[in-house]
């Protein structure tokens, strides 16, 4: 019994483990190229069943705690492995041994407390390694990265427990494109720890305090291109000139991101610019200046310039004591060599005239997303200000008058590129004055409704996208590039206005078509972006766009952004794929063919009507319909005649001289209705026939060869037949005046054939001795 229980328990464990493995494998989604996505699936282990077909595996943001030797042993072709943001605390020694093709490994933000070089000893192809955010204190007792000759990006450290950097830590790394070290609580830096790396393109340091910053600079200043300092409080920073004054430096760019300065530490940073002579570019991003800008008492006057700094970028600068800030006149002399200045989102409302005049080498000035207005711009662009300025960016400020803005910039004689986008100009005056060398103008997102001759004729590049323009009719003879997307244009501009245009971007308007002739009229056009419009996919438009193989070289967003808006059955389809029917594309030909077919049909109908008496049948149909509208049975008081006599005019002698004499002069007499005598003059003959038949008790048909040839006799026969069959009575009396062969009766007298087949008829005897009996039978038939 215990053995049976043990066996059952083992099988239950096996089944549950198989179900778990199946569930985890199903948590992965893999495409045919071997890219598997399993991030954010609440996995607690690496799914089993992974094969050599997996090229990329993303298991980030799960609950994985352990990586074993078997988990990835079959993934020999794996190139990308993401295990970040898990709970991994243990990685077995040979877990990555089989991943010889691995190029990207992310183990960041786990719970690894110890790092082992054995993890990486077979990863010769590894180019990217991220170990940030784990809980280790050091990078291990031996060199971690000595077996990674192709490593180009390395991220190590954490914000709390990583406290030591030793000389062995980066041994074996010769060249890195990017090295990021998160060491906010760094306490020990052994000199020359970073010196083993002969070349670093970009070093990112997260340091809370600058205590060890100079020691690190000493080691890297000769092998580094760009140093980025993040999340650092430089209040106590002090630069020692003796440290690096005699060393060959290669640092070209300094970036301070989320760094705090004081007036004193800012001066120390400026000293650094002087002594690290290779620095060409300095960037301050989201920094805070905890001071009032009073540098006069801080020996700043002994610094003559900012070294070789040519580019200065400041974004989102915070100055808590802004309203106590000094005029910065003490730093004016330092700016003479600066060529490019960017100050974005820093609440700048004025550049003092004196500072503008000191910026004698300035070629590029970007004051985007600030508070500049025409009133302050007048002071900033004063006489002799920015004498060599070529590009001025005033995007998203508080400018309102285009005319005034142009006049204020007349002092900038070398200005050729002006960006005043995202200002609320709303309207444009008829005339404006601009610097004489203006070649580029950006007026996008300025809410203008129309363009006027205010724009300078010297323009080569014009951007008026994202406005309310519904037409473009300006003559700009030198314009080469036009950006006019996101407006309300209904057609392409006239090419005669823009004779040298080579680039036009006119997407997201309400253009519904353009033709080959329009494109050909732009003789120098090389690039056209016209997608996102509401195209009417007419036959001509489709023929042009689908038939021009070279069109794709001009239309840069072809074919993805070109979609039909109408006709409705192709709406949403790509213009390249839309197809119209023959009737839509050749309407004139189809209409002509239809008319010809209709004419032939009418002609054929006419021939058939003539051949088969169609016109006669139509007349009879009309007469029958008229008869159908009459009451089905006349009331008794409307019966005026004993019999209506239907006969041919050629048989009138027999009817009038024999029948009338025998019936109307008999005692009691019969009252007959004859068309010659009793039809009402002026009344339509069809109505006379119908009324006479309906007012007669019987209808007598005098049949002869002449009868079957008579049209009116046929009408009378039809109406009588209507009463005979539709009213279900016995009103018809047939008199055969002469023998008639039934086969000789025309087909159109079908009713006569039916009556002769269904009713007994009286035959007029030639023998006079039998004629008395004929009249007796006829009188009896009328009375019945």
UniProtKB/Swiss-Prot annotation:
It is found in: Membrane; Cytoplasmic vesicle, Phagosome membrane; Membrane raft. Residues 639-782 form the TIR domain. InterPro entries: Cys-rich_flank_reg_C, Leu-rich_rpt, Leu-rich_rpt_typical-subtyp, LRR_dom_sf, TIR_dom, Toll-like_receptor, Toll_tir_struct_dom_sf. Glycans are attached at residues 114, 199, 248, 442. It is a single-pass type I membrane protein. Residues 1-20 form the signal peptide. Ubiquitinated at Lys-754 by PPP1R11, leading to its degradation. Deubiquitinated by USP2. The chain crosses the membrane at residues 588-608. Disulfide bonds join 30-36, 353-382, 432-454. Residues 609-784 are cytoplasmic. It holds the Pfam family TIR. A motif (ATG16L1-binding motif) lies at residues 761-778. LRR repeats lie at residues 54-77, 78-101, 102-125, 126-150, 151-175, 176-199, 200-223, 224-250, 251-278, 279-308, 309-337, 338-361, 362-388, 389-414, 415-437, 438-457, 458-478, 479-500, 501-524. GO terms for molecular function: NAD+ nucleosidase activity, cyclic ADP-ribose generating; transmembrane signaling receptor activity; triacyl lipopeptide binding. It comes from the Eukaryota. The keyword Aminoacyl-tRNA synthetase does not apply. There is a cross-link at residue 754 (Glycyl lysine isopeptide (Lys-Gly) (interchain with G-Cter in ubiquitin)). Residues 21-587 are extracellular. Keywords: Cytoplasmic vesicle, Disulfide bond, Glycoprotein, Immunity, Inflammatory response, Innate immunity, Isopeptide bond, Leucine-rich repeat, Membrane, NAD, Receptor, Repeat, Signal, Transmembrane, Transmembrane helix, Ubl conjugation. One of its GO terms (biological process) is toll-like receptor signaling pathway. Cooperates with LY96 to mediate the innate immune response to bacterial lipoproteins and other microbial cell wall components. Cooperates with TLR1 or TLR6 to mediate the innate immune response to bacterial lipoproteins or lipopeptides. Acts via MYD88 and TRAF6, leading to NF-kappa-B activation, cytokine secretion and the inflammatory response. May also promote apoptosis in response to lipoproteins. Interacts with LY96, TLR1 and TLR6 (via extracellular domain). TLR2 seems to exist in heterodimers with either TLR1 or TLR6 before stimulation by the ligand. The heterodimers form bigger oligomers in response to their corresponding ligands as well as further heterotypic associations with other receptors such as CD14 and/or CD36. Binds MYD88 (via TIR domain). Interacts with TICAM1. Interacts with CNPY3. Interacts with ATG16L1. Interacts with PPP1R11. Interacts with TICAM2. Interacts with TIRAP. Belongs to the Toll-like receptor family. Ester-bound lipid substrates are bound through a crevice formed between the LRR 11 and LRR 12. This is Toll-like receptor 2. The gene is TLR2.
